[in-house]
C-alpha cells in the first residue's frame, strides 16, 4: 500500500492523545514569533514518522537526531502558517473534503475505508482533517510567495524547447533522493568548509553502502528529509540547472555531489531512470454542424425533431448538409460556411458534442446531439494526425522552467523566512 497518510505534501499525521499519559501537562517545545510548537506536536509527529518508516522498511536515525529534524520542520510550518493567517488564507470545508477524497481515491479507498484505516492506526479523523487543512494553507502560502518571485522569459522557453528537441536526454526521467547540507545566510569561509566536509563525508558513506534515506533523515535540511529525501519522478530539465548538469551522465544507483548552491551543498541519489518518446502527435477532426437553439417559439423536442427531419432530407438527397446549415443553423460563426468548423482537436468542443463527434466515422452524420449550446446535427468530414512536437516542447519547457526556478527559489525563500523569524527552542 502507498504511504497514504503522507500523500499530501509529505505530511505525517499527529497521533491522537492515546499515545500520551493523560496526567502529563503539555509543554512548549519552541517559541516561534507569537506562536508555539508544543511537545505533543513533536511527539505526535515522531510517532507517525516511526510508524510510516516501519511500514516502508525505512531506517531511522537516533531519536535525538530525528527529534531535531521534526522540530525544525514544525518550526518552519508554524512560520508559514502565521504568514497565512496574516494574509487571510482560508481553506473551505469543500476544498478540504475534496483534497481528502482525492487522497482516498489515489489509494483505492472509499471514505469509510479511509476512516477505518485512520482509526486502526490510532489517528483521529478530526485531527487528520485539521492537519490536512494546515498543510493546504502552507502549500498555498509557499506557492503564492515563491511564484511571484519567478519570471520565465520567452527567450528562456525558446532556448529550452530547442534543447528538448535536440538533446538525447531531453525525455529522461529520474527518480531521486536528495540531501541538503544547509548554509546560513552570508556564511563565513569556515562555515562553508565545514559544510563541504560534512557533505563529502555523507557522500562517502552513501557510496560505501549506507542507507541514503537514513542519511537524509539524519542530516538533510530539505523539506523532504523526513521522507528519506525522496523527490520522486521528474524530467531532468525540471531540476535546478546545477542538478541537471551534474546528472546528465548519471546512471541508476549513482551518488552525485556534493553540489554547491546558494543555500548549501546538495547530494543526490539516482534511484532509477526511464525514457519517453519525444515525438508528439494529436488527432485533429474536420467537422461541420447545424445548431438549433431552443427558444419560446421552438422547444427542445421541436428542435430535435426538426434536426431529424433535416437529416432525413440530407440522406435522401433533397438537400445538402452545407445548404441546410446555411438555411437553418443558428451558429453565426459557421452557418455561412455551410456549418464548417475547420480543423480542430476534439477537446476544444463541448463535452457532449465532442463525445458524439469522436464516435462518428468519416462521412457519417450523427443523430441530434444536445449540448450546453442547444441541439446539433454533426458530420465528420475527415481526421488527420498532426505533429505537435514543437508546441508541446514549448509548453513542456515553460513548465520545466517554472518547476526548476520554483525549486531553487523555494529553498532561498524558506531560508529567508527561517532567518527572519524569532525562534527560541526550549527543549532538547
From Swiss-Prot:
Entry GO MF terms: peptide binding; peptidyl-prolyl cis-trans isomerase activity; unfolded protein binding
GO cellular component, as recorded: outer membrane-bounded periplasmic space
Keywords attached to this entry: Chaperone, Isomerase, Periplasm, Repeat, Rotamase, Signal
Localization in the cell: Periplasm
Signal peptide: 1-20
Domain PpiC: 171-272, 282-382
EC number per UniProt: 5.2.1.8
Top enzyme class: isomerase
Cross-referenced Pfam families: Rotamase, Rotamase_3, SurA_N
GO biological process, one term: protein stabilization
Keyword Transport belongs to the record: no
Reaction it catalyzes: [protein]-peptidylproline (omega=180) = [protein]-peptidylproline (omega=0)
PANTHER family membership: CHAPERONE SURA
Function, in words: Chaperone involved in the correct folding and assembly of outer membrane proteins. Recognizes specific patterns of aromatic residues and the orientation of their side chains, which are found more frequently in integral outer membrane proteins. May act in both early periplasmic and late outer membrane-associated steps of protein maturation.
Comment block on domains: The PPIase activity resides only in the second parvulin domain. The N-terminal region and the C-terminal tail are necessary and sufficient for the chaperone activity of SurA. The PPIase activity is dispensable for SurA to function as a chaperone. The N-terminal region and the C-terminal tail are also required for porin recognition.
Protein name, entry field: Chaperone SurA
Organism: Salmonella choleraesuis (strain SC-B67)
Gene designation: surA
Amino acid at each position: 500500500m502507498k504511504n497514504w497518510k503522507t500523500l499530501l505534501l509529505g505530511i505525517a499525521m499527529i497521533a491522537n492523545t492515546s499515545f500520551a499519559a493523560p496526567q502529563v501537562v503539555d509543554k512548549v517545545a519552541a517559541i516561534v514569533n507569537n506562536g508555539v510548537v508544543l511537545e505533543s506536536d513533536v511527539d505526535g509527529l515522531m510517532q507517525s514518522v516511526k510508524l510510516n518508516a516501519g511500514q516502508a522498511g525505512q531506517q531511522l536515525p537516533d531519536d535525538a537526531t530525528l527529534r531535531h529534524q521534526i522540530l525544525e520542520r514544525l518550526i518552519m510550518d508554524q512560520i508559514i502558517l502565521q504568514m497565512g493567517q496574516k494574509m487571510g488564507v482560508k481553506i473551505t470545508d469543500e476544498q478540504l473534503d475534496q483534497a481528502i477524497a482525492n487522497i482516498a481515491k489515489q489509494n483505492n479507498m472509499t471514505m469509510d475505508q479511509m476512516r477505518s484505516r485512520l482509526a486502526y492506526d490510532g489517528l483521529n479523523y478530526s485531527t487528520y482533517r485539521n492537519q490536512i487543512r494546515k498543510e493546504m494553507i502552507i502549500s498555498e502560502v509557499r506557492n503564492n510567495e515563491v511564484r511571484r518571485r519567478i519570471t520565465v522569459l520567452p527567450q528562456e522557453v525558446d532556448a529550452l524547447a530547442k534543447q528538448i528537441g535536440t538533446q538525447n536526454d531531453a525525455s529522461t526521467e529520474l527518480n531521486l533522493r536528495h540531501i541538503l547540507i544547509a548554509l546560513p545566510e552570508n556564511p563565513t569561509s569556515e562555515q562553508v568548509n565545514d559544510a563541504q566536509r560534512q557533505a563529502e563525508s555523507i557522500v562517502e558513506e552513501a557510496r560505501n553502502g549506507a542507507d541514503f534515506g537514513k542519511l537524509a533523515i539524519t542530516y538533510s535540511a530539505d523539506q523532504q528529509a523526513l521522507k528519506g529525501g525522496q523527490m520522486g519522478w521528474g524530467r531532468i530539465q525540471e531540476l535546478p540547472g546545477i542538478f541537471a548538469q551534474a546528472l546528465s551522465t548519471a546512471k541508476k544507483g549513482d551518488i552525485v555531489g556534493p553540489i554547491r548552491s546558494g543555500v548549501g551543498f546538495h547530494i543526490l541519489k539516482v534511484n532509477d531512470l526511464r525514457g519517453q518518446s519525444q515525438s508528439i502527435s494529436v488527432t485533429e477532426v474536420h467537422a461541420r454542424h447545424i445548431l438549433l437553439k431552443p427558444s419560446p417559439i421552438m422547444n427542445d423536442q421541436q428542435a430535435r425533431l426538426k434536426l431529424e427531419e433535416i437529416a432525413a432530407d440530407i440522406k435522401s438527397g433533397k438537400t445538402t448538409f452545407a445548404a441546410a446549415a446555411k438555411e437553418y443553423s443558428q451558429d453565426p460563426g459557421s452557418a455561412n460556411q455551410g456549418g464548417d468548423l475547420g480543423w480542430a482537436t476534439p477537446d476544444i468542443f463541448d463535452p457532449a458534442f465532442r463525445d458524439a463527434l469522436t464516435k462518428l466515422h468519416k462521412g457519417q452524420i450523427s443523430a441530434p446531439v444536445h449540448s450546453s449550446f442547444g441541439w446539433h446535427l454533426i458530420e465528420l468530414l475527415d481526421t488527420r494526425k498532426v505533429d505537435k512536437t514543437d508546441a508541446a516542447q514549448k509548453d513542456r519547457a515553460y513548465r520545466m522552467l517554472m518547476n526548476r526556478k520554483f525549486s531553487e527559489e523555494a529553498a532561498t525563500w524558506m531560508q529567508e523566512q527561517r532567518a527572519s523569524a524569532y525562534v527560541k527552542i526550549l527543549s532538547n
